[in-house]
Structures are given as structure tokens and as C-alpha cells.
Amino acid sequence: GLELAKDKGFDYLTMKALADKLNVTPMAIYRHVSNKSDLINSVLDAFVCDVDVCNHEISNLDWKEWLRATYTNMYISLKNMPSLHPYLGNAPRFGPNAMEVLSKILSVLRTAGFNQQQTINATSSLTGFMIGCSIMDIAFHQSLSKSQQSSYIPSTIDSGLDHIFTALSLELEANNKAIAVS
């Protein structure tokens, strides 16, 4: 399913198209997924596994460097598969690969000292920022050559991450001061 979505886009991902690609009947596909929504969720989760946005060791980097690498990888992956964007907000559940990525992000933030609500807010802000940037950059990326696309990471991404990390660092400092006072 992921290969079909990469080749033709998510709009062309249907039970029949997948069955044709696999040389089976559409009914054979229904033995594994109950409907198109399940098929899309399975392919979204396969995409998360395939791009491996967290392919770097947590222990080797501080929380900001690790998150910068993770979210930059996410940005690059999302901009390279624009047909995925309409489905990001419509997935009824996270698959195991997406849950693993989320778990790693939450763990890095909690280990850095953020409380539970701050961790959720930070994850939401960073993810929303990266998805938004990738969507906004699609038109621009489509006008670049393939070699330019693979090496382009706009400075607005780094600048935006710097701003978010500054705000998160201030929040973490306030946490540490509050703990020291109590």
C-alpha cells in the first residue's frame, strides 16, 4: 500500500488499486483491512516506520538537538509526500509506529524536566508547526528541481524551532525555579 501511495499518491490508494498492484482480488484485501479508512491508517503507519524520523540516539543529544533532528526529519518526510497531508488530521487512531515516535518525543521532553501538560503542549506545538510548514512549502518545493528539493530546508524552519525552543527553555527554567523554592 505504501509503495502505491508513494508512486501515485494517497488519492489513488483504493482497495481495487492495491489488489491490482498485488495481483489479488479486492476481497483478499478485505481480509486484512475492513475499509478504506483502515487501509489508509495502515499505510500512514507504514509511512511513519519507513521514514524513521527518530533514527538518532536520544542519549547522544540534548533535548533541543534531538527534537530539532526529529522534527527536521519529519518536515523533510512530509514535504516529500504531499499527498499525505489531507489525511494527517483525519486518522482516527495512531498505529504502533506513530505511537512509538510519539512515545520517544514525550520521553525526551519528560526527561528534560517538563511536566505532563507542558510535554503535551510542546509536542502539539512542534508537530503543528512542522506539519504547517511542510504544507505551506509544497507549492514552493514543486517549483524546485529534484536536487534542490533534497537539500532545501528553509531557514524559517530553523528560526521557528529556535523560537519554540527558547519559549520551552524559559518554561523549563521557571519549573526548576519553582521546584527550588518549594
Predicted regions and their residues:
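Helix-turn-helix
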Residues: 3-38
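DNA major-groove recognition helix of helix-turn-helix
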Residues: 33, 43-44, 123
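Hydrophobic alpha-helical connector segments
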Residues: 53-90, 97, 116, 123-126
